[in-house]
C-alpha cells in the first residue's frame, strides 16, 4: 500500500511525469506506454520487461531517448538461464492450460470438449510448441488434468530430458514443419511456447494451417510478447482476450501473468 511505501521512506508523487522528472532510475514491470516516451530523459535508467522484438515503435522511441534500457527478459546468468523471465514464464505456462481448457467450452466458441475427458470418453489432445519453461509448465498442467500431450522442440537434448521427467501421457517429438502439419488435424488445444532470447518468435503455424484444424480448436500463443509463433496472432487484452479466424479460437493476451497478480508479484520478488 502507499502507507507501507511511506513507512519505508518512499515519497509518493501524484503523476508519472513527476516521477520521471526527478528519478535517475525507473523500475517498472511492463514496457513504457507511448504517453511516457516524451518523459524519458537521456541517461535515465529504465529497468523493466521491454520485449523489444514485438514493437518497432517502442524500440525506436527508446533509441531516440538515449536512455539506458535494461530488459528483464534478457538478463542472463553465467549458465544462460533467464532469472527474471523464468518466473513469469512459469506463471504463463500454467495459465495457458487453464484458459485453454476454459475456451474449449462450447459457450466460449470451443469444441465443447473436457480437457481430461471422463471414464469411457477420450481426453483432449494438446500440442505444446516449445519445450522451455513455458512449454514444460503447460505440459505438466495439461498432463495433470489427464490430457494427451505432445511437446515439440528442436533441441533433442531437451526432449530427452522431458521424456524422462514427464508422466506417461506426455510424448515428445522433434519439431519440423511436417510434424506440426501432421498433428494439427487431431489437436484440440495448441500452446505456443517458443522463445528465442531477445528475438522475434518464428511463425510455426501459418495462416493457411488454420484450415487443417477442426472448428473450435483453441490456440493460446504465450509467445505473443515476442511477436507470436502463430502467424494469425495479434495481441489481445484481459478485457477482450479472444477472437476467431476460420472458426479457430485465438487467445493472445500479452502479459498473461497480470491476471494473477498475487502469484506473479511474489514469483517476481523471489527471482
How should these model regions be labeled?
Residues 22-23, 187:
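An anion/phosphate-binding loop that grips the pyrophosphate of nucleotide cofactors and donors
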Residues 164-247:
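Rossmann-like adenosine-cofactor binding region
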Amino acid at each position: 500500500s502507499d502507507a507501507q511505501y511511506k513507512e519505508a521512506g518512499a515519497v509518493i508523487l501524484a503523476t508519472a511525469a513527476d516521477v520521471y522528472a526527478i528519478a535517475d532510475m525507473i523500475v517498472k514491470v511492463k514496457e513504457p506506454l507511448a504517453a511516457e516516451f516524451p518523459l524519458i530523459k537521456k541517461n535515465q535508467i529504465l529497468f523493466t520487461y521491454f520485449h523489444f522484438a514485438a514493437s518497432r515503435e517502442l524500440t525506436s522511441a527508446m533509441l531516440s531517448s538515449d536512455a539506458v534500457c535494461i530488459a528483464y527478459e534478457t538478463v542472463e546468468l553465467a549458465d544462460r538461464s533467464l532469472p527474471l523471465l523464468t518466473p513469469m514464464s512459469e506463471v504463463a505456462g500454467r495459465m495457458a492450460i487453464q484458459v485453454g481448457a476454459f475456451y474449449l467450452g462450447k459457450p466460449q466458441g470451443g469444441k465443447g470438449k473436457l480437457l481430461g475427458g471422463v471414464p469411457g470418453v477420450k481426453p483432449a489432445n494438446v500440442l505444446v510448441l516449445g519445450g522451455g519453461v513455458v512449454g514444460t509448465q503447460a505440459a505438466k498442467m495439461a498432463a495433470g488434468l489427464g490430457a494427451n500431450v505432445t511437446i515439440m522442440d528442436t533441441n533433442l537434448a531437451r526432449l530427452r530430458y522431458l521424456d524422462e521427467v514427464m508422466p506417461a501421457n506426455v510424448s515428445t517429438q522433434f519439431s519440423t514443419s511436417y510434424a506440426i502439419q501432421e498433428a494439427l488435424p487431431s489437436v484440440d488445444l495448441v500452446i505456443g511456447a517458443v522463445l528465442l532470447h531477445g528475438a522475434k518468435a518464428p511463425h510455426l503455424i501459418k495462416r493457411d494451417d488454420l484450415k487443417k484444424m477442426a472448428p473450435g480448436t483453441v490456440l493460446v500463443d504465450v509467445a505473443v510478447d515476442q511477436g507470436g509463433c502463430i502467424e494469425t496472432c495479434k495481441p489481445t487484452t484481459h478485457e477482450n482476450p479472444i477472437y476467431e479466424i476460420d472458426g479457430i479460437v485465438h487467445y493472445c493476451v500479452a502479459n498473461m501473468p497480470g491476471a494473477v497478480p498475487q502469484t506473479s508479484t511474489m514469483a517476481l520478488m523471489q527471482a
